């Protein structure tokens, strides 16, 4: 057995014949001579063979780092996946099989020992000669690789049973190879080429696992493919996590209605000061132990001064301003009566410092800001309305305490903010009557009077969100579809509420009615599908708060419910209603049916509509101005048709109008013409009265830049409830609002 110039010995050449060596080669790996005459003795053959295997194993481990060594048999075996992806040798039908008595090396069908990589330089010495070896391109490539200078060998550590320690193994990174080494490495074949070759099948050996390795060199998610497989997978995973986090942050900054008020908006400073004052004022009050209210609490005023430096009483702020919190203890108890958790309240308003604003103020000059989750409204009010609310605060608190199912607006806070060299801005925080997860297909604002209480139907509406009034209600033969049981409950509560308002000298309030058609659900996509919405079934996401009340699910909104509600039959519609509502809604009778009050027939069976009802505009006193208006309009018109009448007369007329509007018969919705936008033609069958409340001239306006869609009324009738006739679709997308009192 002779050793060639490269120091490689073919184990198949070892036979019983003892080959001769010169004196320089007649030494073992430790430098000891095998025989004085330079020849091997037969008794030394086995030990020399073991030394050769260790040497060859060391070569392979340094040349191909991805090799596993099994200590049980002391035979190195390559990683399965790497072994398969480096099958660059064609099958050799003339390969010689090893002797059955040899247990140290196993020869595969290609003639290469099982433990050696196919692209290793040692393969050339172990591969038996074949007739077509000179013409094989793989062998030519291998010869070129063998002719290149090989890296120097590291000394073998014989003290350890493991031939190569982990510290001696080069790093498993393709990027550490030099450019010349990369160029000299044989190219890997594609998966199809491997399967088409006559190489050993991947499943022929026990324990093999197929691994698909991309060799195209293209970037995946911006990550280079020439890094380790584990690092590459981890980098891809981290990049996708970052992308998902960025999408969630963008979704959190979305608003459901109006224009987003953020940095750069002309009213951002005002909105920032409002939210900062609310956060500090409510947090200070909630941090104290609860106690009973005293008469002084109804007139209390807490002042805060904010600047960029801050002090021991107030934190630093981005702007200098003054903030005043009115009756904080009273509104704390009111929030508890409305089942609103303080932490949930603050998170909804101030977690992202994002509000949405109506595009233009109402006739009264008030501005409306909505929390980003559409649950709360911040409304600026006149100084006279601010004073009047403080005057009636005690009566309002007692009424809410004694009538937990009241229909009047829910006030959560009364505040004032003053900018340097600016005017004082009074504002109130209250509830939004309409839920964010339901489309409101038609909206009405009812007062019981008819003079000037009409939205002209002969002229198309500028926006698809139009709030109609009393005359439109009467002309369309609209009514509240309540059976005998719900009729009695509803009228009893309306009577109690208007009696309280009349006793306080309040008039000019109105009944806000939003109608949701269950047969249509949210299929019209009135809201933009990219905006966040609530999932009414939030019980599994809710966590208890410190004071024992259940808190809403992080105030984060879920989008899966908006488009999930499709047309269903009348007997199935009631079964699809979520059993759980918002914490502050589910405890009230008139908000118990998916945030509203579901229609019923004469047998008190559930109907096909949900009514969202509330009494708004509570801060209009029968003042001197209203008396003059009553005298002026009373010259040419009867008191029964004008709005400015004394509170007692107004309450009586209002109750009679509501009472006459309740019927158990089926309700039929009619369309309203829409003004064409952007050159689009709108036919008479298009619907415009869809979506949430479109604020009228009393409550402000909203103009979202979304074009309405149209659909044939005939296609809509195919999806209608079997007991309800729908004559038109509701394709509008803009969102409108409920602007409750003041």
UniProtKB/Swiss-Prot annotation:
One example of a Gene Ontology biological process annotation: regulation of mitotic cytokinesis
Comp. bias (Polar residues): 158-181, 193-218, 680-719
Biased composition annotated in UniProt, kind: Low complexity: 90-105, 129-142
CDD domains given in the database record: PIPKc_PIP5K_yeast_like
Domain of life from the UniProt record: Eukaryota
Pfam families, per database record: PIP5K
InterPro entries named in the record: PInositol-4-P-4/5-kinase_C_sf, PInositol-4-P-4/5-kinase_core, PInositol-4-P-5-kinase_N, PInositol-4/5-P-5/4-kinase
Cellular component annotations (GO), alphabetically ordered: cell division site; plasma membrane
Name the record gives this protein: Phosphatidylinositol 4-phosphate 5-kinase its3
Species in which this protein is naturally found: Schizosaccharomyces pombe (strain 972 / ATCC 24843) (Fission yeast)
Gene: its3
């Amino acid at each position: 057995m002779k050793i060639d110039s490269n120091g490689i010995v073919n184990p198949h050449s070892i036979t019983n014949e003892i080959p001769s060596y010169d004196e320089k080669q007649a030494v073992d790996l430790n430098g000891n001579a095998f025989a004085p005459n330079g020849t091997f003795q037969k008794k030394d053959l086995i030990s020399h063979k073991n030394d050769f295997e260790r040497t060859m194993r060391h070569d392979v481990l340094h040349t191909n780092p991805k090799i596993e060594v099994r200590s049980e048999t002391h035979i190195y075996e390559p990683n399965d996946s790497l072994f398969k992806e480096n099958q660059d040798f064609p099958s050799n039908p003339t390969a010689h099989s090893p002797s059955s008595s040899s247990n140290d090396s196993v020869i595969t069908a290609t003639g290469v020992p099982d433990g050696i990589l196919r692209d290793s330089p040692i393969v050339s010495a172990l591969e038996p000669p074949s007739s077509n070896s000179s013409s094989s391109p793989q062998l030519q490539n291998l010869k070129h690789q063998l002719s290149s200078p090989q890296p120097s060998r590291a000394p073998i550590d014989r003290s350890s049973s493991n031939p190569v320690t982990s510290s001696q193994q080069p790093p498993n990174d393709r990027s550490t190879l030099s450019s010349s080494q990369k160029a000299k490495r044989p190219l890997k074949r594609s998966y199809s080429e491997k399967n088409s070759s006559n190489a050993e099948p991947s499943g022929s050996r026990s324990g093999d696992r197929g691994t698909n390795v991309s060799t195209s060199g293209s970037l995946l998610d911006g990550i280079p493919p020439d890094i380790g497989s584990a690092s590459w997978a981890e980098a891809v995973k981290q990049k996708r996590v970052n992308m998902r986090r960025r999408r969630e942050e963008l979704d959190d900054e979305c608003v459901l209605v109006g224009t987003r008020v953020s940095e750069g908006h002309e009213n951002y400073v005002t909105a920032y000061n409002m939210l900062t004052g609310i956060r500090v004022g409510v947090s200070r009050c909630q941090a104290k132990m609860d106690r009973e209210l005293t008469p002084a609490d109804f007139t209390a005023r807490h002042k805060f001064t904010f600047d960029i430096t801050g002090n021991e009483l107030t934190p630093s702020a981005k702007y200098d301003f003054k903030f005043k919190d009115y009756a904080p203890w009273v509104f704390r108890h009111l929030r508890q009566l409305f089942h609103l958790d303080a932490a949930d309240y603050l998170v909804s308003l101030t977690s992202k410092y994002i509000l949405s604003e109506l595009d233009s103020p109402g006739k009264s000059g008030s501005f409306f800001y909505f929390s980003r989750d559409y649950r709360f409204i911040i409304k600026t009010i006149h100084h006279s309305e601010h004073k009047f609310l403080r005057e009636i605060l005690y009566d309002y608190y007692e009424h809410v305490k004694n009538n937990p199912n009241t229909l009047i607006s829910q006030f959560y806070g009364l505040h004032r903010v003053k900018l340097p060299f600016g005017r004082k801005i009074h504002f109130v925080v209250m509830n939004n009557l309409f839920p964010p997860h339901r489309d409101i297909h038609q909206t009405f604002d009812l007062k019981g009077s008819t003079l000037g209480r009409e939205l002209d139907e002969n002229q198309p509406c500028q926006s698809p969100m139009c709030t109609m009034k009393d005359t439109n209600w009467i002309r369309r033969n609209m009514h509240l579809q309540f059976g005998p049981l719900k009729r009695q409950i509803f009228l009893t509560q309306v009577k109690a509420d208007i009696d309280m308002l009349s006793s306080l000298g309040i008039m000019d309030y109105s009944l806000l009615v939003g109608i949701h058609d269950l047969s249509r659900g949210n299929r019209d996509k009135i809201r933009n599908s990219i905006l966040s919405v609530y999932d009414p079934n939030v019980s599994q996401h809710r966590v208890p708060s410190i004071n024992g009340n259940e808190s809403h699910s992080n105030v984060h909104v879920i989008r899966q419910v908006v488009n999930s509600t499709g047309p269903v039959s009348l007997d199935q519609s009631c079964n699809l209603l979520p059993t759980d509502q918002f914490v502050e809604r589910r405890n009230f009778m008139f908000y118990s049916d998916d945030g509203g009050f579901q229609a019923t027939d004469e047998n008190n069976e559930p109907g096909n509509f949900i009514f969202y009802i509330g009494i708004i505009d509570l801060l209009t006193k029968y003042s001197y101005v209203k008396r003059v208006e009553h005298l002026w309009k009373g010259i040419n018109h009867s008191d029964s048709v004008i709005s400015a009448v004394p509170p007692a007369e107004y309450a009586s007329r209002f109750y009679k109008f509501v009472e006459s509007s309740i019927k158990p018969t089926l309700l039929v919705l009619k369309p309203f013409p829409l003004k064409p936008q952007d050159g689009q033609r709108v036919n008479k069958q298009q619907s415009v009265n869809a979506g949430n409340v479109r604020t009228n001239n009393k409550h402000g306006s909203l103009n979202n830049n979304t074009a309405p869609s149209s659909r044939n009324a005939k296609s809509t009738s195919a999806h209608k409830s079997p007991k309800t006739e729908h004559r038109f679709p509701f394709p509008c997308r803009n969102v409108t609002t409920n602007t409750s009192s003041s």
